[in-house]
Regions:
Chain B
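Transmembrane alpha-helices and adjacent helix-loop boundaries
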Residues: 2-282
Length: 248, 282
């Protein structure tokens, strides 16, 4: 079976700084892929290349069999099929929670206001946030804001979801509520790519783990292979550092 | 058991009360001394009686008020029109300057030249060039009324200022907001309309209102083109009586006109400050 999302020979540099070097990854439908690696290993750039927020220097990206990295592609319509959630939530501060969630469905998917709001309220209810529909983002806790940001991405009915360090700005209690939501999305069959420092969570939720080192895919495998039997010295060093920091 | 403040706390509160009483007394005494000093200097000046007679004459003030107030109605009409077009044109220029598409390069270039030019030219010069130069062209369909041309000159100058304020607001919106909107699939123009502009305009409302206050008073400058506004009406009165009090009347009316907007601006700024503090930002 062809993978839902496929990166082949991706290369990206900023000036003379080569950030991603010949990266090739397959993301099967309904799988959860976790990307780990030290700061500066290229995780965020990889995520930003995947939703075309960065221009590629070389290589190809296929979504559902079609080349979305082709020159002259309708970038807006590609992005509408990919849900992205960022470390800093990036909710729109001038819009209520409900309006944050319905903005893209109304403008991009052209849903009627009532349809979009019904859908949004259903999602909010499912994830225990229905009483926050009319609140503005600044009145929510960090964990609530990030859950709203994830719901906002899911509401556009994306083919898959990119989660870039979505818990890095949260304290442990709030991290738990966000991770619970992500686990629920996985159980519903959402295809996800997650860049994270939460190794415990990565072990539990990942179907496959990718260790990025100096812009290259250094090691891939199941969580058991990556965390219990690391092959390369670099991965052992990385896991050792996490262990010392109490993150593993 | 009910709470009883400790004797230490009672002492502290008493000391605080004493200090605040002392501050009030000092402020009163200082204001009184300062006021007396100014009064003595002015009333003691050699030409005081003459100035008082030619600038603060109650008789002429009453006489001038109706025609000056009537002139102010013209200022009001001018500034309502001018404010509308200033905001509209300023917004369009600001948007033009923040576009990135190569097709729109000429538009960006024109907008840049426009703001550079009209922010640099003294308003009085623009008024004279537009008000006297355009009628000189003798193009039949262009109105040559001083009021219309004066308004055009005000709009030209002030839209350049307002455009820069709005552009600063647009560029002040965090780039991650734009990124989040684009990641959701919104187009460039949808992002501008629904995400960037609402935040930008909210952030620049106080400086924007400040420019409008300035526009209100500068609407008096159209009198140089011969429009009978408040200042021109005061001038006519002065020419008849050789007394300058009508100018003071016009000045007082302009101040009264701007005070509501100034207070509104202050109030809005305070409100925004406190809202941001409530959000725990900065």
């Amino acid at each position: 079976m062809k993978p839902l999302f496929q990166i082949s020979n991706l290369r990206k540099s900023f000036g003379t700084n080569l950030v991603l070097d010949d990266v090739s990854i397959d993301f099967p439908a309904q799988s959860t892929t976790v990307i780990i690696g030290a700061s500066g290993s290229g995780k965020s750039t990889l995520m930003r290349c995947m939703n075309l927020l960065e221009e590629l220097d070389d290589g190809q990206i296929h979504l559902d069999g079609s080349d979305i990295s082709a020159y002259g592609i309708e970038i807006d319509s590609v992005r509408a099929q990919i849900g992205s959630v960022f470390q800093a939530f990036n909710l729109f501060p001038h819009l209520s929670v409900l309006d944050n969630i319905t903005l893209a469905p109304r403008l991009v998917q052209k849903l009627k206001k009532e349809t979009a709001e019904k859908l949004a309220l259903e999602l909010l209810k499912r994830f225990g946030l229905e009483d926050k529909a009319d609140a503005f983002p600044n009145l929510l806790s960090g964990g609530q804001q990030q859950r709203v940001a994830i719901i906002r991405a899911v509401a556009t009915n994306p083919k898959f979801l990119l989660l870039d360090e979505v818990t890095s700005a949260l304290d442990p209690v709030l991290i738990a509520e966000v991770l619970t939501l992500i686990a629920e999305l996985k159980s519903e069959g959402m295809t996800m790519v997650i860049a994270t420092h939460e190794m415990g969570f990565a072990k539990k939720i990942a179907d496959s783990v990718i260790f990025l080192h100096h812009g290259r895919v250094h090691e891939t495998g199941t969580p058991a292979q990556i965390f219990e039997a690391p092959q390369s010295q670099e991965l052992r060093d990385f896991l050792g550092a996490l262990h010392q920091a109490g993150r593993l | 058991m009910t709470y009883q403040p400790s004797s230490l706390q009672l002492q502290r509160e008493a000391a605080k009360r004493r200090a605040s009483r002392r501050s009030t007394l000092i402020a009163l005494a200082s204001t009184f001394a300062f006021g007396t000093l100014i009064a003595v200097v002015i009333t003691g000046a050699q030409g005081y009686e003459k100035v008082k007679a030619s600038f603060f004459n109650w008789h002429y003030a009453k006489q001038a008020l109706p025609s000056v107030a009537h002139g102010l109605l013209l200022n009001l009409r001018v500034l309502v029109m001018a404010e509308f077009f200033v905001l509209l044109l300023g917004l369009l220029i600001a948007i033009a300057r923040t576009t990135t598409s190569p097709v729109l390069y000429p538009l960006r270039l024109i907008a840049t030249i426009y703001t550079d030019l009209f922010r640099g030219l003294p308003l009085l010069l623009v008024l004279l060039l537009v008000g006297l130069g355009i009628p000189g062209l003798r193009i039949s369909w262009i109105p040559n009324s001083a009021v219309v041309l004066g308004t055009v000159a005000l709009v030209l100058t002030y839209s350049a200022y307002v455009a820069e304020v709005i552009r600063a607001g647009i560029e002040g919106v965090n780039p991650t907001q734009r990124q989040a909107a684009r990641a959701l699939g919104l187009s460039q123009s949808q992002t501008l309309e629904h995400v960037v502009l609402p935040q930008a305009l909210r952030n620049v409302t106080p400086p924007l209102l400040n420019d409008l206050v300035s526009l209100q008073k500068d609407s008096g400058l159209i009198s140089v083109l011969g429009a009978v506004d408040a200042i021109r009406a005061a001038g006519i009165q002065t020419a008849q009586s050789f007394n300058f009090t009508p100018y003071l009347v016009a000045g007082a009316l302009f101040v009264l006109l701007t005070i509501p907007l100034t207070r509104f601006t202050d109030w809005l700024t305070r409100k925004q400050d406190s809202r941001q503090r409530a959000q725990g930002q900065w």
